[in-house]
């Protein structure tokens, strides 16, 4: 977890119970599901797929994240909100000023769950390459300024507490350095946990989308920039789950935002192929 996560937990203990976190978590679920639904609707234009994926999202959080209050669950609204924003941006439907919100979401999400930085870094690199290829130099520079401004809005509050509490070096070492240098979160048997987590990832069905997205990534495929971000984020994040040396299923929650969107694309492909076969049979 990050600074905002521990701040929320501390406030809950100050108020006497972690039950105070439940309304915040329900709000997080609602916002996450809403952004996920909008993203899937944009990519597939099918309400039934968007609804199904949203239901799977809530079921997955209820099973893999049983008990709740995990950092990634509070970070998901920011991650899925950014995915929806980038989907619209690469489709030409977002204004450059909206990158202030993207910068805000990126910093806030990372301060709830540091490992979401994988997604934020990959998305920033993709935005840079996209602007470079399309020669949007002035727009790219303006977007950077907007992102920095959005970052500052969040970092100012965070740094105020960190500096006043004199925990700067401890925070950097324990939250940032540790999360990206230590894959293991527990000390269970490596091979057993690797087999267990591999089976859990396979059983979750989240690999389906990642393994069937090739036709969405090349040529003139729609929204291919954000799909590359999702696939790479999925791959890098799933490594953390597989090598966590933990029997906890909650580690798979980190791949849910990316895996479900990719799975929605796979479902859309399956429906289209089925419709083509039906149409072909009717002609014959």
Residue map of PLM features:
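Membrane-interface transmembrane helices that cradle and orient dolichyl/undecaprenyl
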Residues: 44, 80-101, 133, 210-222, ...
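Membrane-interface alpha helices of multi-pass inner-membrane proteins
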Residues: 97-114, 120, 125, 234-243
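Short acidic/glycine- and proline-prone juxtamembrane loop motifs at membrane-interface regions
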Residues: 65-75
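Hydrophobic/aromatic-rich transmembrane helices and adjacent perimembrane loops
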Residues: 118, 244-279
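Transmembrane-helix signature of polytopic, membrane-embedded enzymes
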Residues: 27, 33-60, 76-77
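Short hydrophobic alpha-helices at membrane interfaces in multi-pass membrane enzymes
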Residues: 85-108, 137, 142, 146, ...
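Perimembrane helix-loop-helix junctions
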Residues: 119-152, 217, 261, 273
